Amino acid sequence: MLDAGTLAVIPFPYSDLSATKRRPVLLLTAPDAYGDFIGMAVTSQPGHTDNMAILQAMMESGALPKASFIRTDKVVSLNQSLIVKEVGKVTESLRLQAVRRLCSRLTGVSPG
C-alpha cells in the first residue's frame, strides 16, 4: 500500500515534457481516491539548491542504490498508475522536513 513517505520509481517527466526517465520520487501525500499524489523528485546529484540528503538512518524500510537527495524545488502531481516499483519509505520526520521546506519556499517564511 502506498503511503506518504514512500519512495517509488516512476518515469519522471522532464520540465519541458519532451521525455521521461525512470527516477525515484518521494510521495508527500498518500494517493487520493483518484490515485493522484503530490511528490518530490529524488536525485543522486548533490549540487542542486534546496536538496535534502536521504541518509540510510532516515529510511524506515528499503534503500536507494546511491547516495540520494530530495529535490524540494521539484514538486509534481502524479498518478499511482505511473509507479514502476516501490523502493522503500523515509521516516515521518524527513517527510515533514521536506514539506516544511516546500512551505517555506512558497511563503518566503523560514521553516521554524
Regions found by a protein language model. Give the residues of each.
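C-terminal terminal-subdomain/extension
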Residues: 60-112
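Compact nucleic-acid interaction/catalytic patches
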Residues: 16-21, 27-60
